């Protein structure tokens, strides 16, 4: 049996739950399409045991296999949206904090030099 990488053995519970939900949803999508595991696995280019592991939400199944399953159900185009920077509110907050920190208090002389003496009068 292959050794489990350390990263997979320490997944946060929320990630484990999310993967199980994704696997269950993909299994439901396959069943609603009245496809057998054998046929679906063949369409995906994987073995039936790998398909079963994916449908169980196994974190050891490659992202590419999950992506192929999403593509088969017409949801492949949603993958880039998962990490779209415009939805990364934590990074935006860090950017704002860094910008505020960098903002230096300017002396009147430096403001005059930057804006020109005429602008202040």
Per-segment meaning from a language model:
Residues 58-71:
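Short, basic-rich loop-to-helix N-cap that marks the start of a DNA-contacting helix
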Residues 1-18, 82, 86-121:
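N-terminal flexible/basic segments that precede or flank functional cores
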Residues 43, 69, 82-86:
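Short acidic/histidine-centered micro-motifs embedded in hydrophobic/aromatic stretches
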Residues 34-52:
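Short alpha-helical DNA-recognition segment
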């Amino acid at each position: 049996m292959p050794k489990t990488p350390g990263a997979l053995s320490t997944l946060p519970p929320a990630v484990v739950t999310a993967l199980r939900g994704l696997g269950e949803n993909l299994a439901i999508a396959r069943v609603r399409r009245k496809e057998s595991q054998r046929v679906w696995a063949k369409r995906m280019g994987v073995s039936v045991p790998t398909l079963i592991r994916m449908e169980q939400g196994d974190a050891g199944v490659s992202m590419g296999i999950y992506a192929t399953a999403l593509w088969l159900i017409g949801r492949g185009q949603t993958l880039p949206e998962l990490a779209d920077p415009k939805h990364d509110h934590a990074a935006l907050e860090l950017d704002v904090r860094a910008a505020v920190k960098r903002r230096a208090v300017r002396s009147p002389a430096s403001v005059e030099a930057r804006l020109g003496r005429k602008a202040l009068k």
